[in-house]
């Protein structure tokens, strides 16, 4: 059994990968992404990783707060891919596939992806992903910080009322320490395995296969408008192809979606 520590995680990783990683684990941070972005701006190298047992100010997409239960897995990974802004969605898709595989390896549960950045198990959201980047004068990324937060087991007393309908955990109970170490190591192995050939976008077909929204009735939510339609496909640019109720078909690249019950 491996302890939940930086060395414990490295001990599980393949040796060639472990030698390229620099992991620091904290009991608590306000946000692993915020902490790692500061290191990135100061010149930290690719492969720098920050992990926390708990976040006091976790962040999600669109500036939302992210619920961070004590003893979850909150991990941020620094990469330096030198790509344009339009390539960032593929980093998110790659991360989602890597985490879905890691979950299946560690808890043997079917993991599905809700476009564009959430992982669901047994119909409940167990993981959120947030990728953040900075760009140079040539519009190429100076760094990308990949953040993922995973609910390992259900919190004592259940999830807060405002998210209890959608939030879930990998296990109702169990050894968090062992599972967190195994999950972190599996995620890093899958992530860097795909990152080695990210330009091929070989993960995109699997991203499509794992989609939990394709073929479903959905609502596309923006600050000024909510529209209803059906998710038809995910295109080669990782946009969601939606046939709206009015008859138009659009390739959606931004916004929030919810799956509707017909």
Predicted regions mapped to residue ranges:
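N-terminal lobe of the biotin/lipoate ligase/transferase fold
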Residues: 1-105, 127, 135
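Short loop/edge segments at beta-strand edges and connector loops
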Residues: 27, 113-115
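Long, positively charged amphipathic alpha-helical accessory segments at protein N-termini or as interdomain linkers
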Residues: 2-10, 85, 93-111, 121-262
